[in-house]
Amino acid sequence: MSLQICILTPDRVFWNQEAEEIILPTNTGQMGVLTNHAPIITALDIGIMSIRTQKDWTSVALMGGFALVKQNQVTVLVNSAESKETINSSEAEQAFLEAKEQLEKALGQKEKVEANFAFKRARARYQLVS
């Protein structure tokens, strides 16, 4: 028995396949899901989702959202999702370094929140390709 994984973004179905295991980036840390997991709804943070199929592991950068686990079906609703193949590694590294610098320079509360969001997004994309 396996999990049916569906990753949805506002504009498309990003992933709709079976998997043996997933690891989700929740707001309270990483959460693993195997078959017959208890039903749960959880908020997702910006980060890397790992998916284990019968053959290998695949990673996807998620940009925040929610996940519903119920009866071996996992529905992931996210603002955006990216695969390794769609990200330019040098651009991702440059964006990560710039976001890190902006986070260090941020002064006001609003600036810090915006810089932290940009940093987390850039870090997820960079981690995916490195």
Swiss-Prot record:
The keyword Membrane applies. Keywords: ATP synthesis, CF(1), Chloroplast, Hydrogen ion transport, Ion transport, Membrane, Plastid, Thylakoid, Transport. SUPFAM superfamilies: Epsilon subunit of F1F0-ATP synthase N-terminal domain. Its main location: plastid. One of its GO terms (molecular function) is ATP binding. It is a peripheral membrane protein. HAMAP family: ATP_synth_epsil_bac (MF_00530). F-type ATPases have 2 components, CF(1) - the catalytic core - and CF(0) - the membrane proton channel. CF(1) has five subunits: alpha(3), beta(3), gamma(1), delta(1), epsilon(1). CF(0) has three main subunits: a, b and c. This is ATP synthase epsilon chain, chloroplastic. It comes from Tupiella akineta. The gene is atpE.
